[in-house]
Amino acid sequence: MQIAKNLDCQIAYFSLNFETVKDLISAGHSVGVYENESIVIYHQSKTIPIAHVSNIPLTMNGKASFMIQNVLAAVLGTFLSGVRPEKISQSLKTFIPSPQQTPGRMNIFKFHDFNIMIDFAHNPAGYIAIKNYLATIKANKKIGIISGVGDRRDEDLQACGKTAAEMFDYIIIRQEKNLRGRTEKVIINLLVKGIHEVRSNFPYEVISKEIEAIAHSIIIAKKGDFVVALSDVVSNAIEVVQFYLDQETQSLKSS
């Protein structure tokens, strides 16, 4: 809103909160808003419902608020570019998130006894978004695989560790890539410092290589667990998880 005050052009707004933008709607601005669990556009005194979030796979049935934000921005921009609301609605309903369509964006792999999710979150804001999503997920135990990026500030790495400890029950730290001028030990120590802000005896272990960390998480995961791999090399993580899922599928077929 502060930025808008300094702009000299036509401005459209989007928000998760109707109260935040109701005055803008009354003033005649084009607005996309999350209202009554639906994506709605207000434009030229018209109220244009687009879709209920339960019909938008990208939002994970409305559980991923940051994905709703992304959808709002995309819908509003598309609508103002002249695409018909019906076309937008149909596109949202048929765009299915997957490792192929949206690699590294909440890719969920369903194993027989547990699930694994891969996401590209690698900064404090990304970790908080994942934390908010996981708060809606029921699981026996939530296991996180995390790492740090070397060119981040100390406080950012600590914040990632702290948020990880707030959303997971067990953490595997891996750190083989993106050292960017720091040593593996320094990055890990900063993550651990953040973890210990939550609990001094929080359970974690260090497995440097991502492939080995993911394999270990699959070995220790129990029925009803939810594993989250926050990866900075998404293609590798997807390939590894898919390999183990294919192995399990083949084994179940043979038994």
Question: Which residue ranges define each predicted feature?
Answer:
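ATP-dependent carboxylate-amine ligase
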Residues: 53, 57-58, 64, 73-86, ...
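Conserved phosphate-binding catalytic cores of ATP/NTP-utilizing and phosphoryl-transfer enzymes
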Residues: 67
